[in-house]
Amino acid sequence: MAITDWPEDERPREKLLSRGANALSDAELLALFLRVGIRGRTAVDLARDLIARFGTLTRLCSATSSEFAAIPGMGLAKYAQLQAVMELARRALSETLCARDLFDSPEAVRDWLRLRLGHLPHETFCVLLLDARNTLIDAVDLFRGTLTQTSVYPREVVKLALDRNAAAVIFAHNHPSGAAEPSSADEQLTRHLKDALALVDIRVLDHFVVPAHGKPTSFAERGLI
């Protein structure tokens, strides 16, 4: 049965317009993105297939073009559309962060970090550069790979902060394995970088660990800064 034959209050588009996007399931939201199904399968059916195939929305959104296009009914055009939607979400959250004190919007910071780092298959170290009012100047992915005191160079972090005239920084890195807990190496690295930046009067306000799924962990909230 086609979606147009469903009761009106069960159709994803009509449900969104009458009750808001929060009322829709993951599959219904994804079906609106897909717009149409294929022979014998509605857009909702295809959406459920995608979620079942990848397990989570995070894995779906971080799929490669070849993985995405391998699903019946999908293709490179849909993959490009999905990446565009994700980038729009990242940019919208970046505008929010740039317009206000980051400490007034901690959940926006977490949401943005999940979008920027949570889907990456490799460990990435990101530096958020803040001005004296704690508004975002820029965010830079500085290092990739296994992060240790020997792979993250303090001089590069200090140089970046000075070049951007930052008054403070927030660090973030992802754990592709899914673990949200800071490791002892993470704590040692943070102390090492904090000491280096203190020499040039730049504050380290926080360090977030971003898991593949779930809520990023704040060092500051744990008393580790």
UniProtKB/Swiss-Prot annotation:
Gene3D superfamilies: 5' to 3' exonuclease, C-terminal subdomain, Cytidine Deaminase, domain 2. It holds the Pfam family UPF0758_N. Residues 102-225 form the MPN domain. SUPFAM superfamilies: JAB1/MPN domain, RuvA domain 2-like. GO terms for molecular function: metal ion binding; metallopeptidase activity. A motif (JAMM motif) lies at residues 173-186. Zn(2+) binds at H173, H175, D186. This is UPF0758 protein azo1137. InterPro entries: MPN, RadC_JAB, RuvA_2-like, UPF0758, UPF0758_CS, UPF0758_N. GO terms for biological process: proteolysis. Coiled coil: none annotated. It comes from Azoarcus sp. (strain BH72). Keywords: Hydrolase, Metal-binding, Metalloprotease, Protease, Zinc. Belongs to the UPF0758 family.
